[in-house]
């Protein structure tokens, strides 16, 4: 029979009692983590969010409490009252913060029982993630998950406190708004009052936060929930949380300083240090050095060693002249046998494809014709990577377009991008040897970077049209506007856009916004949008821009991703309380589900089966 709590009150948590509390009479409450029955003595490990405390039920001390303990099983909810006593020296458990004490219970209440759980929260590793998600309330009891949400709380609190101290107002923007697709599909909400019309859940608060700047709010932030109906990947969720902010009259550096400030505060809140200010790098330079717009600075940059080749050497090696020849350094790669070298070379060639040639520098060194060339490549790569020389235990991979390759008609960025993919693949492949990704407990574990000056437009190969690289409310560079490049040279237009990157992961993206209606309409036209279409989709915003809109800009960073990195979690699902699967299903509540015909009729909807 279950007991009532009555007037009992918890005096301490299961994680706070220490040897200094010995002799005190206390009451703790929690879940039975483990139970060990030794006849007249029963040991219950009682668990709550704060830790675990051992409770001893001695039949000689209280037969009634001992009898209750005989009924208790894992995950029963228990209230235990008794005296704190120091454990004997041999019974101390150094692995537990409460390991020096135990509770000699004189009273035990069973407040609730439990079915046999499909897994125990005491288990350190649970292989089946679907079972964890179905029984999320059990999964969240696990210490690892409790830790993740402690980190999340501390990060969000630190961000709020920092931004509030910098004069930002936290303002909530609507969940139910109009559909203005920003690249992904909207989640739509049918209106009962307006048949055939729909609200949309926000993909971001983008236009509302810009309107807040038009409203004179000056500095806004929000821990914002966002929704995107897109194809899911391991690092995506249909609903997610971002740290969203906007400012009036900023320069890019103003925004950078604010972001660096709240990130430093957030990392410090969980005991981590970072180095500010973050380095800056243009998009073009990032592509040239790393082959990607979100570089991982923990690995050495790539080097274009084209200048060390003579025309005769290029011809002999059948390399396309005038194109990059990219050297990739893999640090601390141990020596390979001839068989391993052959297999390695084959693997590299498979990864880079038929258009690119792989040059084995060690093989060049053994050739009388190319031995000096190998030394020149080494010297160029070492200088660029700020090494005295390319050490013997470093592996140098050099790739370049083959003579006559079909792709050479394209711009040179494709070579850097392909080399960048190879650099990351090799970096992961040999991580155990170069140890660049291992944490050392210093600020160097977190390699931040600002990437700036992105292209404004991207060419869409499917539609054969230019589309926006960030979003259509990003301001182009002033010089590009004045030069008329929006109409004459769209590939050359730069955006006042910036990303903040950490260890090769994009944490956030932002920009200086368009604050003039004429420029905004010009951008819409450049994207192939007619004035009528722009008015239909964004008329309310174009109207607002006519009422003294100040220059403004902002950024949004993924809170879930920041917490995932700080908690050392392997997936966003580990830091979101009730996440969806890769198929956008909530296994715990079994959503989405069909709804009744009556509900559909109220919404004037008739489903069609595909």
From Swiss-Prot:
Family annotation (Pfam families): tRNA-synt_2 (PF00152), tRNA_anti-codon (PF01336)
EC number(s) per entry: 6.1.1.23
Site positions (Important for tRNA non-discrimination): 38
Molecular function GO terms recorded: aspartate-tRNA ligase activity; aspartate-tRNA(Asn) ligase activity; ATP binding; nucleic acid binding
Protein localization: Cytoplasm
Ligand binding (ATP): 228-230, 237, 506, 558-561
Catalytic activity: tRNA(Asx) + L-aspartate + ATP = L-aspartyl-tRNA(Asx) + AMP + diphosphate
GO biological process, one term: aspartyl-tRNA aminoacylation
One Gene Ontology CC term in the entry: cytoplasm
PANTHER family: ASPARTATE--TRNA LIGASE, MITOCHONDRIAL (PTHR22594:SF5), ASPARTYL/LYSYL-TRNA SYNTHETASE (PTHR22594)
Task performed by this protein: Aspartyl-tRNA synthetase with relaxed tRNA specificity since it is able to aspartylate not only its cognate tRNA(Asp) but also tRNA(Asn). Reaction proceeds in two steps: L-aspartate is first activated by ATP to form Asp-AMP and then transferred to the acceptor end of tRNA(Asp/Asn).
Protein name: Aspartate--tRNA(Asp/Asn) ligase
Biological source species: Acidobacterium capsulatum (strain ATCC 51196 / DSM 11244 / BCRC 80197 / JCM 7670 / NBRC 15755 / NCIMB 13165 / 161)
């Amino acid at each position: 029979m279950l007991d009532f709590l009555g007037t009992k009150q918890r005096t301490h948590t299961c994680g706070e009692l220490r040897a200094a509390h010995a002799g005190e009479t206390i009451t703790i409450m929690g879940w039975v983590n483990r139970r060990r029955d030794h006849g007249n003595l029963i040991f219950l490990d009682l668990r709550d969010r704060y830790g675990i405390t051992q409770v001893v039920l001695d039949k000689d001390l209280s037969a009634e409490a001992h009898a209750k303990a005989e009924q208790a099983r894992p995950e029963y909810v228990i209230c235990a009252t008794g005296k704190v006593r120091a454990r004997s020296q041999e019974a101390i458990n150094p692995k537990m913060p409460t390991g020096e004490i135990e509770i000699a219970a004189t009273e035990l209440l069973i407040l609730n029982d439990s079915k046999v759980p499909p897994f125990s929260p005491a288990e350190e590793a649970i292989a089946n993630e679907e079972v964890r998600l179905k029984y999320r309330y059990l999964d969240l009891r696990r210490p690892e998950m409790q830790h993740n949400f402690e980190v999340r709380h501390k990060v969000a609190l630190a961000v709020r406190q920092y931004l509030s101290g910098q004069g930002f107002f936290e303002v909530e923007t609507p969940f139910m708004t109009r559909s203005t697709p920003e690249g992904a599909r909207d989640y739509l909400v049918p209106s009962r009052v307006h048949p055939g019309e729909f609200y949309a859940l926000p993909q971001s608060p983008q236009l509302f936060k810009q309107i807040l700047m038009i409203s004179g709010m000056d500095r806004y932030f929000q821990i914002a929930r966002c929704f995107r109906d897109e194809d899911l990947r391991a690092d995506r969720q249909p609903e997610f949380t971002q740290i969203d902010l906007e400012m009036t009259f900023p320069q890019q550096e103003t925004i950078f300083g604010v972001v660096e400030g709240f990130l430093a505060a957030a990392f410090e809140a969980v005991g981590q240090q970072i180095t500010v200010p973050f380095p800056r790098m243009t998009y073009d330079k990032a592509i040239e050095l790393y082959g990607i717009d979100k570089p991982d600075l923990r690995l050495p940059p790539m080097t274009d060693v084209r200048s060390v080749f003579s025309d005769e050497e290029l011809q002999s090696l059948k390399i396309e002249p005038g194109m990059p020849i990219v050297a990739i350094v893999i640090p601390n790669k141990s020596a390979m046998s001839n068989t391993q070298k052959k297999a390695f070379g084959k693997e590299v060639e498979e990864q880079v494809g038929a258009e690119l040639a792989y040059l084995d520098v060690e093989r060049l060194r053994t050739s009388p014709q190319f031995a000096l060339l190998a030394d020149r490549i080494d010297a160029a790569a070492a200088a660029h990577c700020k090494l005295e020389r390319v050490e013997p235990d470093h592996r140098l991979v050099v790739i370049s377009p083959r003579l006559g390759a079909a792709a050479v008609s394209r711009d040179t960025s494709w070579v850097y991008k392909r080399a960048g993919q190879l650099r990351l693949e090799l970096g992961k492949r040999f991580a155990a040897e170069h140890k660049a990704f291992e944490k050392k407990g210093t600020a160097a574990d977190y390699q931040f970077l600002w990437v700036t000056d992105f292209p404004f437009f991207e060419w869409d190969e499917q539609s054969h049209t230019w589309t926006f690289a960030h979003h259509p409310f990003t301001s182009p560079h002033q010089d590009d506007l004045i030069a008329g490049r929006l109409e004459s040279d769209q590939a050359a237009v730069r955006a006042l856009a910036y990303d903040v990157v950490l260890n090769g992961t994009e944490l956030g993206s932002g920009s200086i916004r368009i604050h003039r209606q004429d420029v905004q309409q010009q951008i819409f036209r450049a994207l192939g949008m007619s004035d009528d279409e722009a008015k239909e989709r964004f008329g309310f915003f174009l109207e607002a821009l006519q009422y003294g809109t100040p220059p403004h800009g902002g950024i949004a960073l993924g809170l879930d991703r920041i917490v995932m990195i700080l908690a050392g979690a392997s997936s966003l699902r580990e830091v979101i309380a009730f996440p969806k699967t890769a198929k956008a299903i909530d296994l715990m509540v079994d959503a989405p589900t069909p709804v009744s015909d009556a509900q559909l009729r109220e919404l004037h909807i008739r489903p069609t089966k595909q």
